[in-house]
Each structure stands twice: as C-alpha cells, then as structure tokens.
Design a protein with these regions (language model features):
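Catalytic core of membrane glycerolipid acyltransferases/transacylases, capturing the structured
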Residues: 99-102, 144, 148-205
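Membrane-anchoring hydrophobic helices of lipid-metabolizing enzymes
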Residues: 16-18, 22-148, 161-163, 170-172, ...
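Short, charged beta->alpha transition segments
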Residues: 130-139, 179-183, 212-215
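Short, flexible loop segments at the rims of nucleotide/cofactor-binding pockets, characterized by
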Residues: 109, 124-130, 154, 201-206, ...
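Conserved beta-strand termini and adjacent loop/short-helix elements that scaffold enzyme active sites
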Residues: 134-136, 178-180, 196-198, 308-310, ...
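Residue-level signal for well-ordered alpha-helical scaffold segments within enzymatic catalytic domains
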Residues: 122, 163-166, 170, 217, ...
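Non-catalytic C-terminal accessory region of glycerolipid acyltransferases
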Residues: 37-38, 208-359
Length: 359
C-alpha cells in the first residue's frame, strides 16, 4: 500500500481506539456512580441491561429526573418522609403544575427580596391571584400599645397564609406567623416564621414551649403574631360535604392569655376542591400532595374574606376568664360568625371529621 495512505489508516484506527477507550472508561465511571446512588456495590460486574431489574431501575431513574424540583422549597414532601411518600407527593405536585411558580418565585427574589422591598405584598399579584377583604383595615380601634394577635380560619393552606401575612405587613409593624415546622422551606420567609411541631413527642413539646416563650416576648415588643389555630387545611367530613376547620388547638389561647393580647378575627371564604376533600378521607400523603394544586387552580381568581371587629383583651377576660378551652371556643365562634352557616352546623360537621384529622 501507499505509505501515506497506510499512515492515515493507522492514525484513524489509533484515534478510534483512543476514543472508544475513553468512552468505555467514562461509561464505567457513570455506571459506578449510578450503582453507588442505587445502593449497589460498584465493584461487581455490570448487570445485563436487558434484565427486568435494570430496565425498572432505568425507568425509576428517569422518573426521578422527571420530577426533579426546579423550585425545591415549594413542596410538601419532607426529607424525613419515607422514600415512596416523597416520590408520590413530588410526582403529584409536578403533574399539578408546581413548576408554574418557578418564574414568579425567581422574579420575587430578584425584584423584591434583593431590593429590600415589601416581601409579602407582591406574592399573590405575581401569580395572578387577587384578594378582596371586607371590613376596615387597619382596624380603627386598634390599640398600638397592646400586643396583637391575628386569628383566622384555614380553608386553603398557602393562599390564606399569604393573605393574612399581607394584612399584617400593611400595619407597618414587625410580624411573625405560627406555622407547621415542615413548611419552613423557603429561606426568604423563615425569619418571619415560628415553627410549631404537632407530633406527640417530648422534642415537639420542648420546641413548642420554646416557640411560645419566643412569641410572648415578641408580642411584648410590638410584633404582630398571625396564627391559624386549626393547624391544618379545612376538610369536609364526607367526600361530598362542606369543609370545616379542623379542631382548634389551645396553644393559641394560652399565648393570648399570657400576653394579654387584643385579637383581630379574620374569616376566609371558600374551600379546597372536591378532589382534595375526597382524598382527605383516606390519608395524609395525597392530601399533602394536592395542596400545591389547590394554589395553582386559584390562579386568575379572587380570594375573598372578612375582617371582624377587634376583640380587646378585656372582652376576652370577660368571656373566657383564664380558661383556655373557653377562650378557643370563643375565638372560634367569633371567626365563624362571619360564615354563611350556623355555628351549630359547623360544630356538628367538625365532630364528624375523620379521626386521624382530629388528633
């Protein structure tokens, strides 16, 4: 053969062998990483890619990539949850349109957090949700020298939480919200949250005592505290009934009595979707997974609520004394006096809620 042609052929073969070797080496490293991620021994020989187990593993890996969170803070899946529960929640949230909120979140960070503007006010407009509240705000008879607690029902979750915080922000005073510890994922709002733990453990009790003491100190310093005594989203007692708040926790009453605080009752109108009510009859996993969907389907709509007359501490003492149960019942009645149903009907439905929701 012509020497130049032979040299060219040898060069091509050499380059081809080098490239093949590099690709094989890279594939081996990738396979080892994948096997380590799957909890397998990377020193074992590679499995047959045609095996059912390997095909299932590849499908599962693609599913994980599919539901990878672009906005990992906005999810009701918690790191401590079982793996399957986390995957179900994230998958349902992904299908329900969770990623719709990524761009508004980034704009919120860029245009409001980074520039030191008001934090809560732009949240709902950025996702095209309006609020319509009846009643005077700020309350004309608000005593600026007395501790203030805002108490509200909890029909939606995220939506009424943001709406109540926006009202607190409008007062021009520092504010905090008592919130379930598992929901403190968004770093930009952690400083305005006080985490409550509802698990029946000593650690939870110690945390709640610490939070209560912190809330009392903040109230004395003029910080407004926002609280949803139900601790969870309103649910219907049956698949096709009307939603009612979960039983209110006496934690709120204890805090108000200790701080000698005045209270503003707020009632948010409406309820979550029928699908949410149906899955709530069976367990927490799908119920949690649908909460982002409930916010997504409210886009383009108007959230409505009513602000009740302020309750001075003197009136609280007159109606409840130092009895925490009486006080929480009194506040429940004042908030739900703004509802379209009678208090007796609401209480009856509350008593028929699934047992696991009343704990």
């Amino acid at each position: 053969q012509d020497p130049p042609r032979r040299r060219k052929r040898d060069t091509v073969r050499h380059v081809s062998e080098r490239v093949t070797s590099m690709l094989r080496h890279r594939a081996t490293r990738v396979l080892k990483r994948e096997r380590m991620a799957d909890g397998l021994d990377p020193s074992l020989p590679p499995p047959d890619p045609r095996s059912g187990r390997e095909r299932a593993r590849r499908v599962l890996r693609k599913l994980k990539e599919r539901v990878a969170l672009k906005f990992p803070e906005l999810t009701y899946a918690n790191p401590d949850d079982p793996w399957l529960k986390r995957m179900i929640i994230r998958l349902v949230e992904h299908i329900a349109g969770r990623n719709f909120f990524v761009e508004p979140y980034q704009e919120w960070i860029r245009e409001h957090i980074a520039r030191g503007k008001r934090i809560i006010e732009p949240m709902l407009p950025l996702i095209d949700i309006k609020t319509e509240m009846t009643g005077a705000w700020p309350p004309p008879d608000l005593d600026p020298d007395q501790p203030l607690v805002i108490v509200a029902n909890h029909p939606f979750g995220v939506l009424d939480g943001i709406s109540a915080l926006k009202l607190a922000e409008d007062l021009g005073r520092p504010f905090k919200v008592l919130i379930h510890k598992d929901l403190m994922k968004i770093p930009e709002i952690r400083e305005m949250c006080l985490p409550i733990d509802f698990t029946p453990t000593r650690e939870a009790q110690a945390n709640n005592i610490r939070v209560r003491n912190e809330a009392l100190a903040l109230l004395q310093d003029g910080v407004t505290i926002v609280v949803f005594p139900a601790g969870g989203v309103a649910t219907s007692p049956t698949m096709f009934g009307r939603a009612v708040d979960l039983p209110w926790k006496t934690f709120t009453a204890r805090m108000i009595l200790a701080a000698r605080a005045q209270v503003v009752p707020i009632y948010f109108k409406g309820q979550c979707s029928r699908l949410f009510m149906i899955v709530s009859q069976f367990g927490q996993t799908l119920r949690s997974a649908l909460l982002i969907r409930e916010l997504r389907i409210f886009v383009g709509k108007t959230a409505k609520g009513e602000i009740g007359p302020i309750i001075p501490f003197a009136e609280i003492k007159e109606n409840a004394g130092n009895d925490r149960k009486k006080l929480i019942d009194f506040l429940f009645a004042r908030v739900h006096a703004m509802a379209s149903r009678s208090l007796d009907e609401i209480k009856a439905d509350q008593g028929r809620l699934p047992v696991w929701l009343k704990d």
